Amino acid sequence: MAVESTMLELGTKAPDFTLHDVVSGRTYTPEAFERNKAFLVMFICNHCPYVKLIKEDLVEYASDYMPKGVGIVAISSNDIENYPEDAPDKMKEDAEEFGYPFPYLFDKEQEAAHAYKAACTPDLFLFDENQELYYRGQFDSARPKNDIEPTGEDLRDATDRLLAGEPAPEKQIPSMGCNIKWKKGNEPAWYG
């Protein structure tokens, strides 16, 4: 089911998490990115067509902006009992196949997804150097079957503005994608 992001309030401090990278095994928290000029948290997964469409472009974005001081993590929060293609071993395969230059973290208990009010994959949260929410919205207007090529223009524009010290874009279009696959009984109030 395709849903839009919840549009967390701008200025919100980056919610805390402690999650493991499925490739390196390292533990990451937002604190690890406090010295970055910006911090991007991306809720993604392996199976969703909305994410599959932009995977290569996410890597290109990361390759362009990580050297400019943007810290990036991707998080998968899906219920792996019902969606085994999103399990950590499959996440690792996906990260290696696409050459993710950022950590791909597994949110087994779905606590990070709850804290960020993540609703869909992809769901993107760009924080400033103080880890206050600057942009939450779509990567770009590309969707499966709409014949628009992914470019990441919305996220790129927001990131460029942030790095230039400009105000956040006034128009922020919600991200759209597959709903987070919540464990039975763990669905948040904003779901469904």
Predicted features along the sequence, with ranges:
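Chalcogenol-based redox active-site neighborhoods
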Residues: 1-172, 179, 186-192
